[in-house]
């Protein structure tokens, strides 16, 4: 019921009052509608604040300690920087280079914002799959070799950058000489199908020759012939050197079983291989280079950095490590400057 006190004697004031009441009613409805819209926008904003903004695909060639550590470092860095606003999808090729191609193509089809390629085969596949999506590599020894670039000077000029796992090969040659100065021959055991391994073989041979060693190469094509090639290397060498090689890392247990029986010590190119079959190594931290790769990804995704102009980054420091269990087999004692492999 509406009280009309003060308006009963005149129709005009009553009419004006009704008009005012209608206007007030419309204003209330508009205000209420505005409040509903504002509330809805606030709810949408709150709901989307934690939603995924970036989709990153990680292609890892194989599962072994070095590559696993690099992937974990990448994930840790990127999630620390972007939190819930990044979705990281990890796919493992289980050592199959062909699977790397399939993985890369799936990431391209999904329209990911960035691809992290862990190991050379993963990088080559990703680079072949897209020229537009930013690609960051890690666990790559030499990008010029991996991407078949001429006159490579540290910047690719295309949609690829990343971090290198190249350890100082001259320092590794010196480590071998410090531990085995009386050895005459060094056998280099590696996979001929890995370009980065071939690069390391060429480079370290120069340093080993400078110490007076006779250098012999023993290459296998895949895991199927690791055992017989390792046996031959042990029979014909005083010491074996294994570069950073994914196939060797996958087959470290097989190599170790043969080398221990033959009493042929192994110097490894990185701590993952040293953990499996080596006496000692001068190594980088794969977790650290993975972490650095994650920081590069953040700069690309969040700050718009141009991947084609980002220089390849290298490990800032190297660590001497040894394997106590294997060292005991050869009666070797290591000083405080060596850490134990984990």
Task: For each feature predicted by the language model, list its residue ranges.
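C-terminal motif of bacterial Sec signal peptides marking the signal peptidase cleavage site
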Residues: 41-45
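Bacterial signal peptide processing site
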Residues: 47-49
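Extracytoplasmic "Venus flytrap"
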Residues: 55-76, 83, 89-99, 193, ...
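An alpha-beta-alpha
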Residues: 56, 74, 161-209, 306, ...
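Beta-alpha junction/loop-to-helix N-cap segments that form part of ligand/metal-binding clefts
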Residues: 89-151, 245-269
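Pocket-lining segment of extracytoplasmic ligand-binding domains
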Residues: 195-264, 270
């Amino acid at each position: 019921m509406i009280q009309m006190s003060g308006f009963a004697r005149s129709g005009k004031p009553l009419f004006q009052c009704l008009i005012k009441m209608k206007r007030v009613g419309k204003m209330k409805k508009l205000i209420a509608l505005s409040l509903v819209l504002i509330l809805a926008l606030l709810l949408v904003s709150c709901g989307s604040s934690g939603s995924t903004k970036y989709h990153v695909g990680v292609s890892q060639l194989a599962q072994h300690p070095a590559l696993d550590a690099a992937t974990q470092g990448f994930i840790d860095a990127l999630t620390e920087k972007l939190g819930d606003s990044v979705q990281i999808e990890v796919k493992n090729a289980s050592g199959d280079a062909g699977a790397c191609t399939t993985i890369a193509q799936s990431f391209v089809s999904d329209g990911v914002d960035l691809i992290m390629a862990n190991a050379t085969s993963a990088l080559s596949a990703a680079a072949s799959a897209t020229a537009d999506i930013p690609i960051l590599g890690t666990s790559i020894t030499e990008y010029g070799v991996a991407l078949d670039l001429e006159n490579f000077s540290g910047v690719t000029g295309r949609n690829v950058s990343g971090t290198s796992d190249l350890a100082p090969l001259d320092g590794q040659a010196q480590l071998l000489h410090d531990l085995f100065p009386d050895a005459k021959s060094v056998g280099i055991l590696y996979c001929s199908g890995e370009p980065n391994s071939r690069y390391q073989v060429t480079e370290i041979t120069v340093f080993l020759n400078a110490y007076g060693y006779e250098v012999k190469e023993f290459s296998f094509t895949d895991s199927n012939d690791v055992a017989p090639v390792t046996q031959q290397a042990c029979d014909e060498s005083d010491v074996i050197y294994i570069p950073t090689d994914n196939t060797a890392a996958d087959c470290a247990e097989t190599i170790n079983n043969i080398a221990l029986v033959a009493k042929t010590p192994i110097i490894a190119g990185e701590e993952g291989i040293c953990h499996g079959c080596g006496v000692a190594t001068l190594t980088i931290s794969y977790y650290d280079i993975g972490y650095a790769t994650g920081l590069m990804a953040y700069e690309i995704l969040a700050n718009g950095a141009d991947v084609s102009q980002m220089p390849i980054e290298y490990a800032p420091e190297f660590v001497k490590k040894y394997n106590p269990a294997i060292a005991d087999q050869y009666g070797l004692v290591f000083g405080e400057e060596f850490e134990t492999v984990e």
